[in-house]
């Protein structure tokens, strides 16, 4: 999973965001910020994992941001994030080629259904990882 020495950000408050946030925390990956369309919905999650809540446009540009949003929302959320920010999204059905050109864009897709209500460890969950460069792909592994 993503390098534990560098903080990350998460966008989203649904099933995948919640499960990944706790998995990252349990793997000692620091989540510095969590953002969502409405900041009210992420306050409890952010507090649980020790993250700050921010607007999508305010996400740090120097760390990986994981988009845990619906497939349809990915293009519009990407437009709100600084184009230099490294981003990975959690959809297996949205092609990298269909999205805006960015230096660091990737897919970080868990090959298992995740739900907020069911606590689980992700150590045995396979992830599909793809990126627009080999260098960035290696950062997501």
Report residues per predicted region:
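Short loop/helix-cap segments at secondary-structure boundaries that form the rim of catalytic
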Residues: 43-47, 59-61, 78-83, 95-103, ...
């Amino acid at each position: 999973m993503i390098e534990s020495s560098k903080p990350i950000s998460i966008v989203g408050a649904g099933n995948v965001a919640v499960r990944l946030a706790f998995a990252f925390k349990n793997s000692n990956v620091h989540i510095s910020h969590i953002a969502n369309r409405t900041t009210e919905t992420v306050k409890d999650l952010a507090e649980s994992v020790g993250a700050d809540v921010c607007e999508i446009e305010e996400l740090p540009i120097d760390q990986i941001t994981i988009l845990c949003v619906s497939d349809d929302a990915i293009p519009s959320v990407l437009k709100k994030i600084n184009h230099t920010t490294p981003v990975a999204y959690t959809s297996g059905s949205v092609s990298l080629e269909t999205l805006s050109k960015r230096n660091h864009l990737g897919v970080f897709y868990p090959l298992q259904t995740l739900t907020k209500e069911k606590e689980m460890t992700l150590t045995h969950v396979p992830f599909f990882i793809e990126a627009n460069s080999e260098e960035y792909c290696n950062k997501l592994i």
